[in-house]
């Protein structure tokens, strides 16, 4: 899927829903002709490499669109750590403008990884060759590299017209106000009426509690998203 849970993910930091290594680093297992049994490779690959890989292995001859993000993995399969993945961008970029959680964006270049919080705009720099747990932030020691990587990250996101977190939050708020909240409150009112008629019904009482929590959560999400949208507008900053 996309990373382990927040517990038991050592030595990786964080887990699902995060762009720290605990949320994006996953093992990949491959077997087939030309692949040495029991071999191990440290070359980073990503899911969007598989399209070109499968096309190549299936014998595709016609050129694929030039603007594809990924690259073929045949060279890595056959040569291991000596193999290379040819992509349009040398860096790996992960962009997660999450409307209900921690909005963040990451660029990895070689052994270095820059993570940017899209709300606070704070950035962290890690050397993954020495610090896979992302415990030591090097941004203060290497400010030029931070600026360089952030410019590359931003330029790439602009080139693919990536969504901003403000846009995803606006769409989310409109979706909630467009029917989700009303439907949730109507269901809650119906369940409360049924429980009032049968106050000893434990299952119905449980359903009321779950429904109430869901309605309260959506109300909090609208409040949070609206507040953060206003913050970005007042600050006049890009949020990608």
Residue map of PLM features:
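A generic structural signal for short coil/turn motifs at secondary-structure boundaries
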Residues: 37-40, 135-137
């Amino acid at each position: 899927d996309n990373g382990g849970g927040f517990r038991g993910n050592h030595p990786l930091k964080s887990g699902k829903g995060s762009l720290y290594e605990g949320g994006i680093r996953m093992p990949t297992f491959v077997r087939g002709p030309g692949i040495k049994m029991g071999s191990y490779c440290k070359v980073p690959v990503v899911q969007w490499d598989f399209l070109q890989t499968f096309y190549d292995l299936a014998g595709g001859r016609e050129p694929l669109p030039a603007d594809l993000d990924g690259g073929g993995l045949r060279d890595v399969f056959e040569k291991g750590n000596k193999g290379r993945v040819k992509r349009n961008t040398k860096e790996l970029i992960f962009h997660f403008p999450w409307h209900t959680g921690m909005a963040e964006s990451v660029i990895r270049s070689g052994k270095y990884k820059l993570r940017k919080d899209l709300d606070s705009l704070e950035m962290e720099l890690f050397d993954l060759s020495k610090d896979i747990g992302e415990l030591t932030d090097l941004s203060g020691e290497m400010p030029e590299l931070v600026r360089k990587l952030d410019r590359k990250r931003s330029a790439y996101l602009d080139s693919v017209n990536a969504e901003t977190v403000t846009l995803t939050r606006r769409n989310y708020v409109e979706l909630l106000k467009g029917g989700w909240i009303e439907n949730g409150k109507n269901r809650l009112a119906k369940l409360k009426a049924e429980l009032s008629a049968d106050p000893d019904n434990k299952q119905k009482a449980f359903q009321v509690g779950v429904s109430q929590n869901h309605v309260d959560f959506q109300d909090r999400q609208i409040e949070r998203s609206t507040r953060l949208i206003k913050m970005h507008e007042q600050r006049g900053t890009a949020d990608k």
